[in-house]
């Protein structure tokens, strides 16, 4: 039986962790210094976050060899 392939789009956007959670980077940070974003908006966009359980289930299907 051939090896299952990981979805390349998911590979670029998400990181499955050993704990079973899926880490991602927030959208809208390409141009953080853009005019129109408040300090609070920029602060909340910093860093990474984990997906909700419902979305996590869908994304995990894209990673056949992740736990």
Swiss-Prot record:
GO terms for biological process: translation. PROSITE patterns: RIBOSOMAL_L35. The keyword Ribonucleoprotein applies. It comes from Anaeromyxobacter sp. (strain K). One of its GO terms (cellular component) is cytosolic large ribosomal subunit. It comes from the Bacteria. InterPro entries: Ribosomal_bL35, Ribosomal_bL35-like, Ribosomal_bL35_CS, Ribosomal_bL35_sf. Belongs to the bacterial ribosomal protein bL35 family. Pfam families: Ribosomal_L35p (PF01632). This is Large ribosomal subunit protein bL35. One of its GO terms (molecular function) is structural constituent of ribosome. Keywords: Ribonucleoprotein, Ribosomal protein.
